[in-house]
Amino acid sequence: MSKSIEKMISHLKNQGFVFQGSEIYGGLANSWDYGPLGCEVKNKLKKVWWDFFVKKNPLNVGLDSSIILNSKVWKASGHIDGFNDPLIDCKNCKSRWRADKLIEEFDSSINTGIMTSAQLEDYINQNNILCKKCQKKDFTQIRQFALMFKTNQGVLEDDSSIVYLRPETAQGIFINFKNVQRSMRKKLPFGIGQIGKSFRNEITPGNFIFRTREFEQMELEFFFDPSDQKDWFKYWLDQIELFLTKKICLDKSNYKIRENLKDELSHYALKTSDIEFNFPFGWGELWGISHRSDFDLKVHQNLSKEDLTVLKEENNQKVLANVIEPSVGVERLMLAIFWQAYTEEQLEENNSRTVLKLPYNLAPYQVAITPLSKQLNQNAHQLFLELLKDFDAVYDETGNIGKRYRRQDAIGTPFVITYDFQTLEDQKVTIRYRDTMKQERILISQLKDFLNSQFN
């Protein structure tokens, strides 16, 4: 059966994973809330990332920096002066577009990142690119639109009180580099990981949770001596692949690694690679890894006048660390996981089922317990309470057994345990596998060992 992103979105809404933001007031463009099951997946995904990149890696430590920072941070990083999108308006229908995206959709081989506003305008005019909405060619001149959300701190609303919602989590790490290095007695190389909200006032967000104005990032800034001979870029790229394939079970056929060309690189980057995923709307960036040189520490050292170097004990020389940055959006990674997991299967006798084949470690519930008859409710519920001590379990006694199986398939529960009348005699329950629908009998006394073997 063919699947579509529209069907998947409807499924996720109906099953309690994702809801339209501010829905009772007509919604808010590209704003999403995560329901009871969605926030379980989200929290588990963040924990898996944190354990892999921070907690279980002896080189790295964690940080949780503020969303609102001193505006000088964004001046130093270049965001205030250069974090903009080129906008163009259609005079005929009043629609607003990103000029670079209009060109890229017209010809995907064009690298708009190196083009000036004048060059973007010339290309649109020379190639007769039309408004996507009304199919007319009557555009305004391009103007640069700031992507940072601006607000005021305190009771006065003047230039001195202007602050911004952070557009990335990275800068909070850079300005705390010396605090972390000193307090944790770290020597190069070491990394600082962070998970947190970021905000970008983008004009054309879309494709469900792929690109939103409010999003969550999982970023690692890895600091190393520029004279270090180890290829840390390759090391962290390999770690990303290991995480994707072994920790969250992404199929290798669904993603590819693309190294950015020199003219695609950001001004601070020596090297960048994108891990791209085959989303329902085509290939798109899933995860980025960049060699940021010493740009970040250097600009903050220059503006703050604070010494951000590290003293090398072997030669008593100061060094300004270089940085490798693996960065991924939580929601974008969730979209990739949902799209791979969402499956519509045709069964025998014209039956079908919709199943979320989520990785076991990301499923909202690991196991469901259900009684075959109302007479067994008390026994089954007691088993549920016992399993709840060690597993993410759910109890389900509504509807017939077939409907319960389909309901658990739809939300990705790997195993359903059925307590039946035979259980009273042999102390065995029926356990059903989500992906294969295979069933087998197992002793209640062996249930925990069985489940632990599946999840570990």
Swiss-Prot record:
Catalytic reaction equation(s): tRNA(Gly) + glycine + ATP = glycyl-tRNA(Gly) + AMP + diphosphate
The keyword Manganese is annotated on this UniProt entry: no
A single GO cellular-component term on record: cytoplasm
GO BP terms, alphabetized: glycyl-tRNA aminoacylation
GO molecular function: ATP binding; glycine-tRNA ligase activity; protein dimerization activity
Origin superkingdom: Bacteria
Assigned EC number: 6.1.1.14
Binding site for ATP: 200-202, 210-215, 285-286, 329-332
InterPro entries: aa-tRNA-synt_IIb, aa-tRNA-synth_II, aa-tRNA-synth_II/BPL/LPL, Anticodon-bd, Anticodon-bd_dom_sf, Gly-tRNA_synthase/POLG2, Gly_tRNA_ligase_bac, GlyRS-like_core
Function in brief: Catalyzes the attachment of glycine to tRNA(Gly).
Protein name: Glycine--tRNA ligase
